[in-house]
Amino acid sequence: MHTALRSILIVTKSGHREAEALGERMRAWLAARGLSARVVENTGDAVSLAVAGQECSLALVLGGDGTILGVARRLLGSGVPLLGVNLGKVGFLAEVAATRWESSLERLLSGGVTVQERLALSFRVERDGATVHSGGAVNDVVINRGILARVINLDLRVGSERLGELRADGLIVSTPTGATGYSVSARGPLVHPQLHVYTVTPICPFLNNLLPLVLPGEARLSVTVRDRTNEVYLTQDGQEGYALQAGDVVHVERAPGGMLFATIEELSYYRKLKAKGFIKDQA
């Protein structure tokens, strides 16, 4: 879908002078063309970011994939589309190269913004019948072991149906957006970002008793921690962690509203896979 630009929120990587300077140049460039723009630093405060984004029609995020992930997670359900400007190394989530930002914004102003709705995940940790922790994820929800090199025991259910017990280093529940992250390193599948599915991929499973699964977006996954001797942690997007206990049940499902990514279609998904080395053409 397309959306008209009214005002723009520019979010810069925390403590990054290049991002701050570029943000100010963008603000001045947009103001000269009659658009309202505000520059804020990504401090990690979800409330202040949500308030800043209430009246904007687009969020420009200046940084690497980590910065884009953090901002996208805090904007879940806000209805504000996000467009990444790459100042990092990989930049798979970024649509715009920092060296070509002016021409990219010109395209935005001339044609409007094309917005893609992508699946995101919500999760909650149930302990003794009560919810003790909850949150959302743009890339993945990971359950894994602590510092000791031991497998952990997890029990998996999809809806009311039990899949079985998994003995592994951990488990990755990934969105299509996160399929090119931790999941693919664990031999999870590449998934087109516009598909409304999510994947379940074991990390080094003992005896390979569970292959990667692709679940429909409507499915609800429940993971029970059976391990009583090892440290087990839940992490969201590789950025925020939470210690789990034996008997905890992690419920994962599709987040309402999902997340919105703006695109100017400079590089198709398949060309991006090739450019980032996920597909190698031998011809």
Swiss-Prot record:
Residues at the active site: D65 (proton acceptor)
Family annotation (PANTHER family): NAD KINASE
Pfam families: NAD_kinase, NAD_kinase_C
Record's keyword terms, sorted: ATP-binding, Cytoplasm, Kinase, NAD, NADP, Nucleotide-binding, Transferase
Lineage: Bacteria, Pseudomonadati, Thermodesulfobacteriota, Desulfovibrionia, Desulfovibrionales
GO molecular function: ATP binding; metal ion binding; NAD binding; NAD+ kinase activity
InterPro entries in alphabetical order: ATP-NAD_kinase_N (IPR017438), ATP-NAD_kinase_PpnK-typ_C (IPR017437), NAD/diacylglycerol_kinase_sf (IPR016064), NADK (IPR002504)
One GO-annotated biological process of the protein: NADP biosynthetic process
Subcellular location: Cytoplasm
EC number: 2.7.1.23
Origin species: Nitratidesulfovibrio vulgaris (strain DSM 19637 / Miyazaki F)
Keyword flag ATP-binding: yes
Known cofactor(s): a divalent metal cation
Role noted for this protein: Involved in the regulation of the intracellular balance of NAD and NADP, and is a key enzyme in the biosynthesis of NADP. Catalyzes specifically the phosphorylation on 2'-hydroxyl of the adenosine moiety of NAD to yield NADP.
Protein family (similarity comment): Belongs to the NAD kinase family.
Enzyme class name: transferase
Binding site for NAD(+): D65, G66, N139, D140, R150, R167, D169, T180, G181, Y182, S183, V184, S185, Q239
SUPFAM superfamilies the record matches: NAD kinase/diacylglycerol kinase-like (SSF111331)
Name of the protein described by the UniProt record: NAD kinase
Catalytic activity: NAD(+) + ATP = ADP + NADP(+) + H(+)
GO cellular component: cytoplasm
